[in-house]
């Protein structure tokens, strides 16, 4: 039994993941497990404005999904982390619904309030069912 992980790297960001020593996504048994994606610029720094940070987190997520031959339509489970959700959740959720969520059936979703995300305000991690051709 091989212990090698089938890691997926989006184009242009491998050095960032290697520096922080984690995999952006791992394929296993027809599923794609995507690490938490934040609104980080190419150098890893946070996008300062909240809405821009959420959009960039989704761009980064979509790049990982695309590198595996998937899209957000293949996502079956979503976990989002929000710093200070009492003041930010509604603004973030309305943006997510309007720009990224898509049509029903929707993935399962869990939102978790946290106190710290290494300078970020929003993080999203997902599990996707890979299309047959990408599995």
What are these regions (language model features)?
Residues 1-59, 63-76, 82-135:
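N-terminal presequence-like segments and the immediate start of the first folded domain
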